Amino acid sequence: IAFHDVAPPFPPQEDWRGWLRGLFERYRQSLQKHPNIAPLLGAQLVSNSGINPLLVEQILAALKAAGFEAPRIVDAYNAVVAAMIGYVTLELAPMPDDDPVDWAAELEDRVRALPAEDYPLLVEHLDLLSNKAFIVRWQSGRVNPLTGGFELYVDMVIAGLEGILSRRKDGAAA
């Protein structure tokens, strides 16, 4: 099983932020070892048939420790699972089956030929973006991982959860 060690027990004294960050990192590492299952996880409801109750329990424990309560803990749980699966599924998307070498070369040529007058910011940042950013890449994260974006994404998810909790503490609806 690819995910047997993704969700270790959440000790009550542990910081929920660090535990969630570790969850995202372990999940990504597991999928990097088994990238062929990535497209199945987010795209087919049948992936739920391999339910991992320990994963659900530990995510809920971390969210409860953060301060989420019913019914909002369900929304937070869904957001965490979607975040955990989403980025990595996109990052590890497989190459097309039909002539992947020509497909990659054609896409690279199309990206590099974009006119600056139509796409000034894209062309200005093309050397930074080319094959290192979603939409303008021609290699999968299997070969060319998007680690910096993943780390920023995890930071954003955790900061978003913190923001929701702090709004609730300030009296706004969370």
Question: Whereabouts are the PLM-identified features?
Answer:
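Generic detector of contiguous secondary-structure segments
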Residues: 17-26, 69-74, 103-118
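C-terminal peripheral helix-coil segments that are non-catalytic and often amphipathic
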Residues: 93-174
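Hydrophobic alpha-helical bundle segments that form small-molecule/ligand-binding pockets
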Residues: 55-77, 88-108, 162-165
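Small-residue-rich helix-loop
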Residues: 81-83
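Hydrophobic alpha-helical connector segments
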Residues: 7-37, 41-54, 70, 77
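Short, basic, alpha-helical segments at the C-terminal edge of helix-turn-helix-like DNA-binding modules
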Residues: 1-5
